[in-house]
C-alpha cells in the first residue's frame, strides 16, 4: 500500500510538472499580430506593446499599414499622407488593449490621466459604459472620433513643445551620466 501511495505521489508530481508550464503559458496574454508586425512607432520609436492601450493601426486604401503608439502619432501620419485615404482605423481599447474600430469607439478626452505623446489624454473604449466608468474615476468628457481628431490637432503645438522639452532633458541626463 505504501508503495502505491509513493507511486501515485510521484505520478502526481510528474503530471504537475507537465501541466503547470503549459497552463502558465496559456495564461500569458498573446501578443497581438499588429504589435508583432509594427513593434515600435515609426515616428517616435515608442514600444507599441507597452502602449497597447493607446496604439493605433491605420490601413490605407493602397494596402499599406501604419502602426502608431498613439493618436498623436497617427494624426501626424494621416496629415503627412493626405493623398492616401484610410480604409480602416483601429485603436487599442483602454481597458482590454484589443484593437477596436476607432471611428465607432467611444472616446474620452481629458481627465487626470496624462495622454500618450500628449498632455491631454484621449482614450478609446468599446462601449459607452466603459467610457463613463473611466470618467467617474478620472474625469474627462465623452467624445466621438471627429471630436478626438480635432482635439489631437488642437493639442499638437503644445504637445510637440512638451515632447521636445522632455527629449532635451533626457539627452542632458544621458550626457550627464556618461
Language model: regions and residue ranges:
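Positively charged n-region of N-terminal signal peptides that target proteins for export
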Residues: 1-4
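Hydrophobic helical h-region of N-terminal Sec-dependent signal peptides
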Residues: 6-14
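C-terminal segment of classical bacterial N-terminal signal peptides
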Residues: 13-22
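Envelope-exposed proteins and targeting segments
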Residues: 37-39, 54, 64, 87, ...
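Thiol/selenol-based redox catalytic cores and closely related redox-interacting motifs
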Residues: 92-155
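N-terminal targeting pre-sequences for secretion and organelle import
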Residues: 139, 144-177
Amino acid at each position: 500500500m505504501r508503495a502505491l501511495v509513493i507511486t501515485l505521489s510521484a505520478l502526481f508530481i510528474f503530471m504537475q510538472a507537465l501541466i503547470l508550464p503549459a497552463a502558465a503559458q496559456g495564461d500569458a496574454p498573446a501578443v497581438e499580430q499588429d504589435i508583432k508586425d509594427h513593434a515600435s512607432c515609426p515616428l517616435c520609436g515608442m514600444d507599441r506593446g507597452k502602449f497597447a492601450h493607446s496604439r493605433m493601426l491605420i490601413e490605407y486604401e493602397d494596402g499599406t499599414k501604419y502602426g502608431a503608439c498613439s493618436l498623436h502619432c497617427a494624426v501626424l501620419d494621416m496629415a503627412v499622407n493626405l493623398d492616401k485615404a484610410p480604409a480602416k482605423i483601429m485603436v487599442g481599447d483602454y481597458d482590454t488593449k484589443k484593437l477596436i474600430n476607432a471611428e465607432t469607439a467611444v472616446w474620452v478626452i481629458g481627465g487626470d490621466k496624462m495622454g500618450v505623446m500628449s498632455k491631454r489624454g484621449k482614450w478609446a473604449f468599446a462601449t459607452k459604459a466603459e467610457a463613463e466608468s473611466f470618467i467617474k474615476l478620472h474625469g474627462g468628457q465623452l467624445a466621438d472620433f471627429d471630436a478626438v481628431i480635432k482635439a489631437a490637432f488642437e493639442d499638437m503645438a503644445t504637445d510637440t513643445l512638451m515632447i521636445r522639452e522632455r527629449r532635451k532633458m533626457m539627452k542632458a541626463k544621458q550626457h550627464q551620466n556618461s
